[in-house]
Regions:
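Chromodomain-type histone methyl-lysine reader module
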Residues: 1-189, 194
Length: 194
């Protein structure tokens, strides 16, 4: 694999192979840490679904620049959207709702202070690292194993959501909505995902 060439999936520029391999190793550590899948026989996949496991591919990106590289690699499933399925839908906050919240925060004098105890309100942004790995898989999905984790005759049965599966966003939505409700938040009436 040392002679193999890797390219940035966004820019198309050639990437340093050693940095790509390090980024992929980091991603595989996350797969193990979050127990994303259990290895099972490909035979089980065929018995349960009547189909081969879903293929996977690496998405490699340099989020930095040539002087300060910041390589990120994500292993994603290649589940093809053959048909539209409403049961896999995940709500997304409309841009208008976000604009309304920011406008309201500014006009009410809340500002963007991290801890504004005087007004009793707080506006904050949260970015969950590898969010989908925190969501349980809610349907039976089998994926091929990447070269870095392959075992002959085996595939992965998802335990957690995986980027590239059709219901990953919905699984994450169910997980974070349950958490937010549990700590006291309520869904909006006009936009339930706010």
């Amino acid at each position: 694999m040392a002679d193999k060439r890797y390219y940035d999936d966004l820019s198309g520029e050639e990437l340093d192979a050693s940095l790509v391999m390090a980024a992929r190793a980091e991603e595989m550590k996350e797969f193990v840490k979050h127990n994303v899948y259990n290895k099972v026989s490909v035979k089980k996949c065929w018995e349960k679904t009547g189909k081969a496991p879903i293929g996977v591919r690496w998405v490699d990106v340099n989020k930095g620049d040539k002087i300060h590289p910041e390589y990120r690699s994500r292993l994603v499933a290649k589940e093809i959207k053959i048909d539209k399925r409403e049961d896999l839908f995940a709500a997304t906050t409309p841009l208008e709702s976000k604009k309304m919240l920011f406008s309201w925060a500014v006009t009410e004098g809340i500002g963007f202070k991290r801890n504004d105890r005087k007004n009793g309100m707080k506006l904050d942004f949260i970015d969950v690292r590898r969010a989908y790995f925190h969501a349980e898989a809610r349907r039976q999905v089998f994926v091929e194993l990447c070269d870095e984790d392959s075992t002959r005759g085996m595939c992965g049965e998802l335990v957690k959501a995986m980027y590239g599966t059709r219901d990953a966003a919905q699984n994450w939505e169910v997980t974070y909505t349950a958490f937010m409700t549990e700590i006291g938040f309520h869904n909006g009436k006009s936009t339930p995902c706010v």
